[in-house]
C-alpha cells in the first residue's frame, strides 16, 4: 500500500493481516491506516477470520451476509449493551465486546484480569464492556496506550490490524475451528 510506510509502527501487522485475508485496503493501493473502522468493517474482518468467503452481493448491503453470520453466532447480540450500527464508527470498547464475543464463539477460554488499576481511564469503561475489556487485556490482545485504554475513542484501521493479529497469535490453537490459526 502506498500509504503504509515501511518504517510505520503498524507496517508488519498490516502486512500480516492483509496476507492472512483479515483486512483489505480501501483500494488496490491504499490502506488508509488512520481512518476509523465501522461496525460493518470489523464484522467483515471477523467473518473472513472465520474462513468465510464473501459472496457476490446482488442486492442489499455489501456487509449483510457477514452481519447475519455475526448475529447467528451471537457476536452481535441485543445483550451487547449498545445498539450495533453497521455504518457507525466503532469505539474501542465496542470493538472489544465484538472481538470477545467472537473469541468465545470460537471456543477460547478468556479469563478476566482482576483489575485495570494500571489504566488511568478505567472509569470511562462502560459497564457492558468491562468483562470484555478485562479479558482481552488479561489475554494480552489489548495492550492499551501507555497508561490508557481509550475505551470511548474511535478505532483506526492500523489499530484494528494490530488487535486482529494479536488475537490470531494468542488464541488457543486446539480451540480453533477455522480461520484464527
Give residue spans per PLM region.
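Feature responds to low-complexity, polar/acidic, surface-exposed segments characteristic
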Residues: 1-11, 24-93, 99-130, 143-154, ...
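Tandem repeat domain/solenoid detector
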Residues: 19-21, 138-140
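Short, compositionally biased
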Residues: 11-20
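Catalytic cores of secreted/periplasmic or lumenal enzymes
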Residues: 133
